[in-house]
């Protein structure tokens, strides 16, 4: 279910402050965050945000097509190991 249009999109306060500081200084540096639930807003465009995937921080460059999506969508948490084998030689 999507968020109500009456509410503003969720963005973590510390992440929002970091982006506003970089925008006022007109600097570009990697922003490290654990907030995967934050929504990408237009002020984030052009920044590189390192999103935590549970093990490490993955750098993601924010473009205009990402606006409205969550940060966690761009940092996968699971690695696919392959389907289970049914062959008898792979069993013990």
Swiss-Prot record:
Q: A Gene Ontology biological process annotation?
A: ribosomal small subunit assembly
Which PANTHER family does its entry note?
RIBOSOMAL PROTEIN S19P FAMILY MEMBER, SMALL RIBOSOMAL SUBUNIT PROTEIN US19M
* Record keywords: Chloroplast, Plastid, Ribonucleoprotein, Ribosomal protein, RNA-binding, rRNA-binding
Determine the domain of life of the protein's source.
Answer: Eukaryota
Q: Does the keyword Acetylation apply?
A: no
**Does the keyword Glycosyltransferase feature in the UniProt annotation?**
no
InterPro entries assigned: Ribosomal_uS19, Ribosomal_uS19_bac-type, Ribosomal_uS19_CS, Ribosomal_uS19_SF
- Its main localization is plastid
The record's listing under NCBIfam families reads: rpsS_bact
Subcellular location as annotated: Plastid, Chloroplast
| High-level lineage | Eukaryota, Viridiplantae, Streptophyta, Embryophyta, Tracheophyta
Which family, according to the similarity comment?
Belongs to the universal ribosomal protein uS19 family.
Q: Name one GO molecular function term.
A: rRNA binding
What the protein does?
A: Protein S19 forms a complex with S13 that binds strongly to the 16S ribosomal RNA.
Originating organism: Amborella trichopoda
List all disulphide bridges recorded for this chain: none
| Name used for this protein in its record | Small ribosomal subunit protein uS19c
**One GO cellular component, as annotated:** mitochondrial small ribosomal subunit
